[in-house]
Amino acid sequence: MTRKQRRLTMIGGALVVLGIAAALVLNALRDSIVFFSTPMMVSEKHIQPGQRFRLGGLVQTGSLVRGDNLAVSFRVSDGSATLPVSYKGILPDLFREGQGVVAEGALDNSGVFQADTVLAKHDETYMPKEVADALKKQGHWKDDYGAQPGAAEASSKQEVSQ
């Protein structure tokens, strides 16, 4: 083999190894990505039990039930559909009925969302952008849910431009 052929063989081999490594990394990341879904999206997508995802919406008023050993159940609604949620752990201090929530976990075989992480709104105007957008899209947005997503950002841009 000439020098040029050896160099091309080495470059080709390196590219193949790099391609395989990239494919493995992308495959691993694809499996660990958690998507955000509203209860309506969950019912439309027919998400399989055990598949991890994030569930966002409002905690339905009157649905919070506290059990033994930090077990809690409640329903998450997006105005069109509701989904029962079961969680075992300490809820955030700002967790309330009628407030925005994002829970991470998976559906069990009975259709109950088994959450292992629950996030609640952190001040009087916060709502996850995805939840607010979903509520607006479905026509269920109410102005008393808090500041519209991006409102603080828009007002700061106005102050800068003046």
UniProtKB/Swiss-Prot annotation:
Q: Where are the transmembrane segments?
A: 8-28
Task: Tell me the segments the record calls region Disordered.
Answer: 140-162
Keyword terms, alphabetized: Cell inner membrane, Cell membrane, Cytochrome c-type biogenesis, Heme, Iron, Membrane, Metal-binding, Signal-anchor, Transmembrane, Transmembrane helix
Q: Which residues lie on this side of the membrane: Periplasmic?
A: 29-162
Annotated residues that bind heme are located at H122, Y126
Record has Metal-binding as a keyword: yes
Subcellular location(s): the record lists: Cell inner membrane
Q: Write down the membrane topology.
A: Single-pass type II membrane protein
UniProt xrefs under SUPFAM superfamilies = Heme chaperone CcmE
| InterPro entries registered for this protein in UniProt | CcmE, CcmE-like_sf, NA-bd_OB-fold
Matching entries from Gene3D superfamilies are given as: Nucleic acid-binding proteins
Which regions face the Cytoplasmic side of the membrane? 1-7
Q: Which PANTHER family match?
A: CYTOCHROME C-TYPE BIOGENESIS PROTEIN CCME HOMOLOG, MITOCHONDRIAL (PTHR34128:SF2)
**Protein's UniProt name:** Cytochrome c-type biogenesis protein CcmE
- Give the source species: Nitrobacter winogradskyi (strain ATCC 25391 / DSM 10237 / CIP 104748 / NCIMB 11846 / Nb-255)
